[in-house]
Amino acid sequence: MNKRFFPTLLLAFVCSTLAYADGGMWLMQQINGQVARMKSLGMQLEAADIYNPNGSSLKDAVVMFDGGCTGVLVSNQGLLLTNHHCGYDQIQKHSSVQHNYLKDGFWSYSLAEELVNPGLEVEIVDEITDVTAAVKKELERIKKPSGLEFLSPRYLSSLAPEIVGKKAASRPGYRYEIKAFYGGNRYYMFTKKVFRDVRLVAAPPSSIGKFGSDTDNWAWPRHTGDFSIFRLYADKNGNPAEYSKDNVPYRPKRWVKVNAQGVKEGDFALIMGYPGTTYKFFTADEVTEWSEIDNNIRIEMRGILQDVMLREMLADPKINIMYAAKYASSQNGYKRAQGANWAIRRRSLREIKLAQQQEVLAWAKQKGIATTEEAVRAISKAIEGRQDLRMRQRYLLEGILMGIEMSNAPAADSDIADHWDDPARREAGLQSIRKQFEAFFNKDYSPEVEKDQLAIALLTRYAERIPAEKQPISIREGIAEYGSAKAYVEMIFDKSIYASRERFEEFMKNPDRDRLLRDPMSRFAASVAYEHQKLAKEVAAFDAPLAAAQRSYVASVLDMKGQPNLAPDANLTLRFTYGEIKGYQPRDVVTYGAKSTLEGVMEKEDPNNWEYVVDPKLKALYEAKNYGRYANSDGSMPVNFCATTHTTGGNSGSPVMNARGELIGLNFDRNWEGVGGDIEYLPNYQRSIILDIRYLLFIIDKFAGCQRLIDEIQPQF
């Protein structure tokens, strides 16, 4: 990693008053400090309408969906809107070649037709409590601290029973979560209702919900109907409960009214949701590490993975269903890394962070605070010290563990090997291996694709990048013995009992201890896992001193700026952000408007490119201009719009509300130029990409003919 400093640029940035430009993402309890500015942009709400700790507010209608997305309640029957890509896994699990809901969409026309989704959870925040004093008191009592407890969600949440009482903490259907903010300088507890009976109600075809797919991802203008619809169910008393046929639709204490009157450039926009991760307090060296190691390796290895997957998906519909979710997930992180690196280079984000760093150091020096400079030096030392380890770790993670499925093959433990002659223990061990095999050899895995393409391509590149002496022993010895990654992979699939179901079942009929222990795929997986654990431990040695230094550095920033003026980094907790509906100029001579229409869908149509196929029914509606009440005043059909709000991953599915707190859209993406907003908000370039609620309603009504949902939502025209 190259360390580069730019003294001339630094002076220019310092003189430009760039210190922590802040577009959000604000904590709910910071609402009072933002209301005046929000009203200056046109908002007509009061603070208590958005967040009221003593009553209902918009906060109560915004949910966390499936641990990493956001959703919004829009009826008194627990109807929930989120993005198509947020519900993608559930849609995929219900899909088959015979009932391909990914391709054709899914529409339930009664409650009885709604589909159950085991394992899916939705959370609603009930209370938010400042527990900083209590947490710091408990942290002081730790007898053998690891040095990271002050940031650990698991450890922090384990303190909840001491804070709220053991009886309260054991309430069925509730979860208490304590998280660190500002690098561990503040702590808040979130009391949540957890719903586990969440049913799929509707989803458009992927040709609508994923229109433009990976080519348009992170891009504006956009033309995507990115939504899916679910419903929360509760027991007959209205409490969260596990699935039961006796459960009834949940009646929330608050839902958001839907406004179908349309939007215009300059309108106020409010977004609430669960942004995942940002890095606004990074030092310059941390930006360099993120770009040159994390992002560069992700771009390289996922590019190889995705090229192979896409080629195979286009050739076989069965493979397409099998790998659809994996490909979408990989592509999302890939393009995010590309966009972040573009912003770091073109928008000089490293230099901006260097300027901010110097500003904090100058402030601390003036105040006589020596710990700030010590913290910056400690951060740089940790980054430099872990450079080679982190590089090896990232190649192993992106290239092997996340890319090659056989790294998840079953591993025979010492218990079955040592007690093979004990029939009971041998059988128990074999059943454990069967369970591992079933988890590994699921419907989302193709041995043929793995053997012939994926494993060879990724393992070849990994071996080119990592010196042999630093590779997992199975990879090092296998490539040396067989002459190439290709020959090594072919040997594994030729000999492993896990290479096919037939071979596995044959082994289970006549199990052999030596064959089990010598299995090449199992040894590959065990060797990779060992190397991963070894690297994780070595990298982790830098975690505690780095976290302590970051905490000290952020404490100085917090003291300098003051908490009311400084939003903390995102960490999957409920936030709000606000701005206006507005286009932008990404580069010279290029200007983008704020809204897109169905006309743009037809302009992009390409029957020979799966990303831009237009459903015949949608095309017929377009040709007839059969838009009903959902059209713009000029007769065009709205699809998407963009706003200056500050969002990131986790905000997918976030409600976008107007000046009166009425739903006008669903956030689903960011523009390419704004991905760097995870480090520094860039108001002239950063845009949230939003599904216009009228397009969602139009698809439900005119495309699907699902009148019961329109009747339930009761949009205001």
From Swiss-Prot:
Its EC number is 3.4.14.-. InterPro entries: Pep_S46, Peptidase_S1_PA, Peptidase_S1_PA_chymotrypsin. The active site is at 85 (charge relay system), 226 (charge relay system), 652 (charge relay system). It is an enzyme of class 3 (hydrolase). Residues 1-21 form the signal peptide. GO terms for biological process: peptide catabolic process; proteolysis. The record marks 670 as: Is essential for the Asp/Glu P1 specificity of DPP11. Keywords: Aminopeptidase, Hydrolase, Protease, Secreted, Serine protease, Signal. GO terms for molecular function: dipeptidyl-peptidase activity; serine-type aminopeptidase activity. It is found in: Secreted; Cell surface. Enzyme activity is completely blocked by diisopropyl-fluorophosphates, moderately by phenylmethylsulfonyl fluoride (PMSF) and 4-(2-methyl)benzenesulfonyl fluoride, and slightly by pepstatin in vitro. It holds the Pfam family Peptidase_S46. Its main location: secreted. Gene3D superfamilies: Trypsin-like serine proteases. Optimum pH is 7.0. PANTHER family: PERIPLASMIC PEPTIDASE SUBFAMILY S1B. Catalyzes the removal of dipeptides from the N-terminus of oligopeptides. Shows a strict specificity for acidic residues (Asp or Glu) in the P1 position, and has a hydrophobic residue preference at the P2 position. Is likely involved in amino acid metabolism and bacterial growth/survival of asaccharolytic P.endodontalis, that utilizes amino acids from extracellular proteinaceous nutrients as energy and carbon sources. Belongs to the peptidase S46 family. This is Asp/Glu-specific dipeptidyl-peptidase. It comes from Porphyromonas endodontalis (strain ATCC 35406 / DSM 24491 / JCM 8526 / CCUG 16442 / BCRC 14492 / NCTC 13058 / HG 370) (Bacteroides endodontalis). The gene is dpp11.
